[in-house]
Amino acid sequence: MIPLRDEIFIRGNGDRVAFSEYGDVSGEPVMFCHGWPSSRIMAQFIDDAARELGVRIISPDRPGIAESSFAVNRKLLDWPPLVSELADFLHL
């Protein structure tokens, strides 16, 4: 499955966040937050359903996964600001 978009976003602090998009490019945006062990490409398995439902899936890699920067001593509470920055970058 080829994603609609596959790129790297550079956060304000310089960290890289790899993300892919699947589904309907003009659909309602939904953040797909993969578990462990996995990566952003896990969202490819819901591409067909997302297209049918008119949903745009945005799937970022967590820190240290694939091409996303590793974050030393990261906490669960570090994830929401990362997702928020990505949403701002995508003008959501």
Segments predicted by a language model, with ranges:
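An N-terminal hydrophobic leader/cap segment in hydrolases
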Residues: 1-8
